[in-house]
Every structure is written in C-alpha cells, then in structure tokens.
Amino acid sequence: MGYVVKEEDSQTGEVTRRGPFVTEKEARMVLANAVEQAYDFNPQLAMANVRQEVEDAVRDGRKDCFDAKGNLVCRYTIEQE
C-alpha cells in the first residue's frame, strides 16, 4: 500500500503516475515539486502566485491548473493505492 501522484493533461487525456511512495508526506513533496514545475515551464498556465499555488496543493493533496481563460489545463492528485 502506498501513495501515487497522478498528473492528468486535460487536452490529451494522458495520465502520468509518479510513485508509489511509502508515506503521504513523500507524495505531497512530489506533488509540490510537480505543481511548481508546471507553473515554471508551461506558458499556457495563467500567471499566479506560484508559492501560494504550491502551498494550496500540499495542503489539499490536489491541484487544478488553469489557463488565462479559465480552462482546465492539468490536474494533480494524490491517491492511495
């Protein structure tokens, strides 16, 4: 039993899994890194306070990322296996 971080690309439907991780804390750290990289490297995403977005993701265990028009671009979630 472990935790995985799933990234879903809403445009292609592709799902990428990272893990499994032994603890939820590990998964949350990977989630934080993934969200930070998404905002750093994806020009589609709306300008945001990246630090706040990462903090929200770690707190909630999930993050939806939107473009400037409000369209969902990607979704990150932590799931227990």
Regions found by a protein language model. Name each.
Residues 33-81:
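Short, mixed-charge low-complexity intrinsically disordered segments
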Residues 21-22:
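Conserved aromatic
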Residues 1-17, 26, 33, 45, ...:
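Short aromatic-glycine-(Arg/Gly/Cys) micro-motifs in beta-strand/loop hairpins
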